[in-house]
């Protein structure tokens, strides 16, 4: 059995090291093998303090560097305006945008996150970004932008490094959880656990986020019980029920394929 990588250890996601979801190969890279740009992206997307001697497994390299943008399925909602997930017509925040917008709004924005048209419109309306401003921030991505990003103090908010709105609101907007059992979750008999002690689905071993997106790296506040950002209103560890469906922006219903 291969040892976990430094990234998995620091993020407490050692159970995900060496998975073959996104690559058929297993192994390690030292961080000094990464380009300076990839190293910077990794630091910003994980919130970690890294050194060249640290290692990253091929799975975590895919998740946080190569496929990070593809895995962001919804608007990062920097202004806390969405009651449901916004997943349509998303715009990727690049390295230069992250520096510029983080400085302008004083909010943590990570390159690779995405904005919906509504949030983009708010940004364009709130900030006078004329052509001169854009030219000032675009050409120098290897110099001033990198220095500015390194100078920003980012706390690590978890696996997906989401901007954290006011306490409690993310869970309210991510899940529509009715008080009556069985309406949006499937209740399993009291003696039958659906999740194991690590929060994995017992029948498949899958680390499924409560938003029901199988590619999601975690979009909730860190669970007070286990620290995972994949637990919704209640910790998944040893849980005896799972969500049957959720409703996202636009009224679309996502059904849990594992609820049957």
From Swiss-Prot:
Organism: Bos taurus
Summary of the function given for this chain in its UniProt record: Through its interaction with ARL14 and MYO1E, may connect MHC class II-containing cytoplasmic vesicles to the actin network and hence controls the movement of these vesicles along the actin cytoskeleton in dendritic cells.
Modified residue annotations for N-acetylmethionine: 1
Covalent link Glycyl lysine isopeptide (Lys-Gly) (interchain with G-Cter in SUMO2), residues: 177
Record's keyword terms, sorted: Acetylation, Cytoplasm, Isopeptide bond, Phosphoprotein, Ubl conjugation
Subcellular location: Cytoplasm
Oligomer and partners: Interacts with ARL14 and MYO1E.
The organism's place on the tree of life at top rank: Eukaryota
Main location: cytoplasm
Name of the protein described by the UniProt record: ARL14 effector protein
């Amino acid at each position: 059995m291969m040892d976990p990588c430094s990234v998995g250890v620091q993020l407490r996601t050692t159970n995900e090291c060496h998975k073959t979801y996104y690559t058929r190969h297993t192994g390690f890279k030292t961080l000094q093998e990464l380009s300076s740009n990839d190293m910077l992206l990794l630091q910003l997307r994980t919130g970690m303090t890294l050194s060249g001697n640290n290692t990253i497994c091929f799975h975590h390299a895919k998740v946080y560097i190569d496929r990070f943008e593809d895995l962001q399925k919804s608007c990062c909602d920097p202004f806390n305006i969405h009651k449901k997930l916004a997943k349509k017509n998303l715009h990727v925040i690049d390295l230069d945008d992250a520096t510029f917008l983080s400085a302008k709004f004083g909010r943590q924005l990570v390159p690779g996150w995405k904005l919906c048209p509504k949030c983009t419109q708010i940004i364009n309306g709130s900030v006078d970004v004329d052509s001169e401003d854009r030219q000032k921030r675009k050409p120098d991505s290897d110099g001033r932008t990198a220095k500015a990003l390194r100078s920003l103090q980012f706390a690590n908010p978890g696996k997906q490094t989401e901007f954290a709105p006011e306490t409690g609101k993310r869970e309210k907007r991510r899940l529509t959880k009715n008080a009556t059992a069985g309406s949006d979750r499937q209740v399993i008999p009291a003696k039958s656990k659906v999740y194991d002690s690590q929060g994995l689905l017992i029948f498949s071993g899958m680390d499924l986020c409560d938003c029901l997106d199988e590619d999601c790296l975690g979009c909730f506040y860190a669970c007070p019980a286990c620290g995972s950002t994949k637990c919704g209103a209640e910790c998944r560890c040893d849980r005896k029920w799972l969500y049957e469906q959720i409703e996202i922006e636009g009224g679309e219903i996502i059904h849990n394929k594992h609820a049957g």
